[in-house]
């Protein structure tokens, strides 16, 4: 019974740490770039897009398709960086718990 209570206490602590980590992830901001920095996407580590910046040289009617491609690439770059930041935080949180690799608590 003591083991069960210990597990419940550990689960409650983990839940508290997860809430704190979610708040930290909201504060982490990454920036994805494409076109040599002509297009930038800012995103939180919670995968929320915070802003998009487009160099004025790209805002031409005949450059629309290029701009769309660059936006998609910048978003993908920001998403990868946000995912890496989230994984880093999750590893720090769950590293001492002895969980099997790839459990996927994130």
From Swiss-Prot:
Is DNA-binding set as a keyword in this record?
yes
Supply the InterPro entries for this chain: YbaB-like_sf, YbaB/EbfC
Top-level taxon in the UniProt lineage: Bacteria
Q: Name one GO cellular component term.
A: cytosol
Please state where this protein is localized: Cytoplasm, Nucleoid
Which keywords annotate this record?
Cytoplasm, DNA-binding
* SUPFAM superfamilies the UniProt entry points to: YbaB-like
Q: Where is the signal peptide?
A: none
**A GO molecular function for this record?**
DNA binding
For this protein, the record's Pfam families field holds: YbaB_DNA_bd
Query: Subunit details for this protein?
Result: Homodimer.
Query: Which NCBIfam families does UniProt cross-reference here?
Result: DNA_YbaB_EbfC (TIGR00103)
Q: What does this protein do?
A: Binds to DNA and alters its conformation. May be involved in regulation of gene expression, nucleoid organization and DNA protection.
Q: Which family does it belong to?
A: Belongs to the YbaB/EbfC family.
Q: What is this protein called?
A: Nucleoid-associated protein RPA0616
Q: Which organism is it from?
A: Rhodopseudomonas palustris (strain ATCC BAA-98 / CGA009)
């Amino acid at each position: 019974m003591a083991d069960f209570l210990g597990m419940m206490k550990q689960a409650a602590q983990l839940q508290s740490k997860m809430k704190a980590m979610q708040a930290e992830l909201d504060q982490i901001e990454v920036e994805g770039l494409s076109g040599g920095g002509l297009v930038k996407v800012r995103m939180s580590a919670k995968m929320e897009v915070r802003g998009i910046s487009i160099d004025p040289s790209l805002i031409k009617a005949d450059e629309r398709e290029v701009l769309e491609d660059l936006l998609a690439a910048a978003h993908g770059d920001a998403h990868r960086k946000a995912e890496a930041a989230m994984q880093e935080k999750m590893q720090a949180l769950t590293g001492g718990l002895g969980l099997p690799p790839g459990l996927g608590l994130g």
